[in-house]
């Protein structure tokens, strides 16, 4: 029904956010990508793409991409019944936040992908935004902080990822000699994951009336590097439990507010119709989350 070249052009532009990056991925010219997307729009009789920076799908574009992805997964699963799986592997995508990937999801991926029959693309974004990748059709699942789903998707509560405001013992001795208060928190280096990250901002505002924009901030957009930066005394920030609970108990990390915490509720959103292999993957995610996350 749809020309494969036109279909891939649209999907890659949405996935990469630009015609230029899509062209590099498809190994064709930017003009060719533009022509293919435009031809598909003419064929459909509607606009499928918002040509902005980054490029985004229209509502009609989202519906089409979801439909195309569903067809792709169903075709792959069907062909796996007749062709050597080594030659024809199922590929799908999931959107997840960095802290979930680093703190509890990786064991699921390791177990599920052992067979070599499935190839996985992981889209990383803040937990408040991962659902957008699912809505746009780029992924078939998303770990997100949003409870509400859009049409044709279902949601299951995974639990809560708990965070504590912490720093290293050496950092504490240097910056918090006079206690943990508005002034000491404002003047000491604060670690922030990225511009979308509101964990520190919300915690400081709610507990100290302190706005993040008047703090001295380091931005470190990598979960493992962020955690190490706290451990090495570069700054203070929100640390996930239970991964770093032992560090707090052993006093390698100092809990700056023992009576306060931040719990981020996480949900798994997924397409209503899924293949047996994806159902198994979903069940493994739910089981692992409920072992690690707070109820």
Regions found by a protein language model. Give the residues of each.
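Hydrophobic hinge/microswitch elements
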Residues: 210-255
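A short LG(V/I)-centered, amphipathic sequence patch enriched
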Residues: 41-59
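Alpha-helical linker/hinge and terminal dimerization helices associated
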Residues: 43-44, 64-86, 92, 285
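Short helix-boundary/capping micro-motifs
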Residues: 11-27
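Secondary-structure junction motif
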Residues: 186-210
């Amino acid at each position: 029904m749809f020309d494969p070249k036109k279909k891939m052009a649209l999907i890659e532009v949405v996935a990469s956010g630009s015609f230029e990056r899509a062209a590099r991925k498809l190994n064709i010219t930017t003009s060719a990508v533009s022509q293919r997307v435009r031809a598909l729009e003419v064929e459909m009789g509607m606009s499928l793409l918002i040509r902005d920076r980054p490029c985004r799908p229209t509502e009609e574009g989202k519906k089409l991409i979801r439909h195309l992805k569903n067809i792709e997964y169903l075709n792959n699963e069907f062909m796996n019944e007749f062709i050597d799986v080594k030659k024809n592997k199922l590929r799908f995508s999931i959107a997840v936040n960095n802290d979930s990937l680093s703190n509890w999801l990786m064991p699921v991926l390791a177990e599920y992908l052992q067979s070599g029959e499935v190839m996985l693309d992981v889209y990383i974004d803040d937990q408040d935004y991962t659902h957008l990748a699912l809505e746009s059709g780029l992924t078939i699942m998303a770990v997100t902080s949003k409870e509400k789903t859009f049409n044709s998707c279902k949601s299951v509560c995974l639990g809560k990822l708990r965070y504590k405001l912490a720093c290293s013992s050496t950092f504490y001795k240097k910056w918090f000699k006079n206690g943990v208060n508005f002034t000491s928190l404002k003047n000491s280096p604060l670690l922030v994951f990225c511009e979308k990250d509101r964990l520190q901002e919300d915690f400081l505002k709610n507990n100290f009336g302190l706005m993040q924009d008047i703090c001295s901030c380091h931005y470190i957009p990598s979960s493992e590097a962020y955690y190490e930066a706290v451990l090495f005394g570069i700054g203070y920030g929100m640390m996930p439990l239970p991964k770093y609970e032992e560090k707090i108990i052993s006093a390698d990390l100092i809990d700056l507010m023992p009576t306060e915490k931040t719990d981020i509720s996480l949900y798994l959103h997924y397409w209503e119709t899924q293949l047996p292999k994806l159902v198994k993957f979903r069940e493994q995610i739910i089981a692992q989350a409920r072992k690690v996350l707070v109820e």
